[in-house]
């Protein structure tokens, strides 16, 4: 069926409140997108996180009277009469069927497979993560997710605690648990991502070892042996002071969602507190890893 998309711009601090306003006005789903960076879509919007300049996008049924929606939103104190927005009619397409047909089991590193829950497992003896992320969250198909999964596969995670900052479908946190981590913590600004992560954790039998939080609910003074953040260069730079305190001394950090051309500026934001490894590139994207000093 066709859909109507309403996009408005705000700050990261207000994104969650305006997301609630769009849902109350009738939106069936919400996407957060960095205004300035190229967003990471896997395979549709939904992977981006909390940053300074944010587009909040609401998806509405094609029969929705958008004049009524705008009138409702104009009553919100963060918007007001005549607030800037863009309304767009989306193509009528069976997104779910097309997405499912093109999502196949994928291998990352030596041990790890990501398998759609509706397909057969290629290797019963491998570390298999069964994934049903829905339309809006990570599946492993994007180079940045692949880079993170390969990195996790190469680590000794036995008994470790892992934080997945911007968890989306939970793919990285769940992979870490299946690879031996004792505990994982997923953080995401999008409530739908939290639910998708919870569902996927139950599907993989690791829900008892995965904690999930919206940023406003996360515990203070969280620490982990390994921290991975697959978001975008803009928020990685902006949130460097927050992300940098999460690894313990000697802990590991993995960052992606970064174009190769942006690597230097992201490295600069973390170099003071981390001993950084050589940047690893895949296609036009890259991964930055390091150890806490």
UniProtKB/Swiss-Prot annotation:
Query: According to its UniProt record, which reaction does this protein catalyse?
Result: L-lysyl-[protein] + 3 S-adenosyl-L-methionine = N(6),N(6),N(6)-trimethyl-L-lysyl-[protein] + 3 S-adenosyl-L-homocysteine + 3 H(+)
Q: What's one GO-annotated cellular component?
A: cytosol
Sorted alphabetically, the keyword list is: Cytoplasm, Methyltransferase, S-adenosyl-L-methionine, Transferase
- Enzymatic class: transferase
Q: What does this protein do?
A: Methylates ribosomal protein L11.
Please tell me where S-adenosyl-L-methionine binds in this chain: 145, 166, 188, 230
- What NCBIfam families has UniProt attached to this entry? prmA
Subcellular location(s): the record lists: Cytoplasm
**Could you tell me one molecular function GO term of this UniProt entry?**
protein-lysine N-methyltransferase activity
Q: What is its main location?
A: cytoplasm
- Name the Gene3D superfamilies for this protein: Vaccinia Virus protein VP39
Its protein name is Ribosomal protein L11 methyltransferase
Q: Which family does it belong to?
A: Belongs to the methyltransferase superfamily. PrmA family.
Q: What is its EC number?
A: 2.1.1.-
Q: What's a GO biological-process term for it?
A: methylation
């Amino acid at each position: 069926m066709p859909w109507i998309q309403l996009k408005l711009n705000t700050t990261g601090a207000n994104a969650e409140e305006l997301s609630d306003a769009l849902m109350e006005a009738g939106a069936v789903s919400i996407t957060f997108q960095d205004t300035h960076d190229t967003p990471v879509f896997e395979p549709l919007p939904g992977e981006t996180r909390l940053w300074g300049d944010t587009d909040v996008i609401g998806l509405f049924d094609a029969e929705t009277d958008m004049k009524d929606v705008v009138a409702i939103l104009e009553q919100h104190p963060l918007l007001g009469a005549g607030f800037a927005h863009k309304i767009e009619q989306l193509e009528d397409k069976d997104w779910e069927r097309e997405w499912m047909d093109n999502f196949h089991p994928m291998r990352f590193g030596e041990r790890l497979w990501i398998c759609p829950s509706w397909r057969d497992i290629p290797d019963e003896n491998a570390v298999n993560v069964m994934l049903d992320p829905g339309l809006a969250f990570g599946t492993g198909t994007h180079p940045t997710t692949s880079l993170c999964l390969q990195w996790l596969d190469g680590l000794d995670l036995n008994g470790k605690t892992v934080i997945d900052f911007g968890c989306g479908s939970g793919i990285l946190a769940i992979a870490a648990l299946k690879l031996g981590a004792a505990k994982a913590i997923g953080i995401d600004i999008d409530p739908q991502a939290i639910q998708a992560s919870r569902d996927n954790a139950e599907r993989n039998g690791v829900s008892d070892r995965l904690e999930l939080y919206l940023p406003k609910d996360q515990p203070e003074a969280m620490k982990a042996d390994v921290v991975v953040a697959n978001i975008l260069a803009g928020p990685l730079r902006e949130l460097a002071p927050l992300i940098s305190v999460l690894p313990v001394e000697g802990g590991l950090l993995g960052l992606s969602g970064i174009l190769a051309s942006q690597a230097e500026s992201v490295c600069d934001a973390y170099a003071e507190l981390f001993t950084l490894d050589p940047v690893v590139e895949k296609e036009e994207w890259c991964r930055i890893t390091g150890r806490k000093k």
